[in-house]
Regions:
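Acceptor/aglycone-binding surface of glycosyltransferases and processive sugar-polymer synthases
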Residues: 1-6, 11, 23-97, 124-147
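Short active-site alpha-helical segment characteristic of glycosyltransferases
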Residues: 21, 99-106
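Short, charged juxtamembrane terminal tails flanking transmembrane helices
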Residues: 152-153
C-alpha cells in the first residue's frame, strides 16, 4: 500500500520480489497500453507451483469469480501495470492476501478498463510463501468476507 501511495509516475508496475515472474515481460504489458486501458494484468500461462498450490489457486480464483464477477482471469497474478491516477480515487485497506482482490474490485468499481496478457510463472527463487500459514489464511478469509459485504459485485 505504501508503494502505491508514494508513487509519482503515470504508471505503476507491480510484481512480487520472489523471482516467480520475469521483469523483462514488463515490455509486454507496456505494449498493451492504450489511452482507454487503465490496468494491464498478467495471468499465469502455466502455474509453476506444487499440486496443492495449483489446486487451491484454481479453486480460489473460481470462488472469487463466482462471488465478485472479477473482470480478470487471475486475481492473484502479481504482475500488473496500473494507471497511477486511479489511486487518487481508491484507498487500499487490506493487510493480507486479500489486497489483490481489494485492488481489482475497487478499480472495477471506479470503472477502470482492464486488459490481460499471459505471462510466464517460475518456481520461487527467494523466500517462502506465507499464504498457507493458518493466521494468514484466516486473515485473508476475513478480509475477503468484509470485501464481499462492502463491495458487492
Amino acid at each position: 500500500r505504501r508503494g502505491f501511495e508514494a508513487s509519482k509516475k503515470d504508471w505503476i508496475f507491480y510484481t512480487d520480489g520472489d523471482g516467480q515472474y520475469d521483469p523483462s515481460e514488463l515490455r509486454d504489458l507496456v505494449e498493451q497500453l492504450t489511452p482507454t486501458i487503465d490496468i494491464v494484468n498478467g495471468y499465469k500461462m502455466a502455474r509453476n507451483d506444487n499440486l496443492i498450490r495449483k489446486i487451491s489457486g484454481f479453486a480460489y480464483n473460481r470462488i472469487l469469480h463466482a462471488l465478485y464477477l472479477i473482470p480478470i482471469r487471475d486475481v492473484d497474478c502479481d504482475f500488473r501495470l496500473i494507471r497511477n491516477s486511479l489511486f487518487n480515487k481508491i484507498k487500499l485497506e487490506s493487510k493480507s492476501g486479500a489486497i489483490c482482490l481489494e485492488l481489482v474490485m475497487k478499480l472495477k468499481k471506479q470503472g477502470a478498463k482492464f486488459s490481460e496478457i499471459p505471462v510466464h510463472h517460475y518456481p520461487r527463487r527467494h523466500g517462502q510463501s506465507a499464504f498457507f500459514k493458518i493466521p494468514n489464511l484466516i486473515s485473508t478469509l476475513r478480509e475477503n468476507i468484509k470485501l464481499l459485504r462492502k463491495l458487492p459485485s
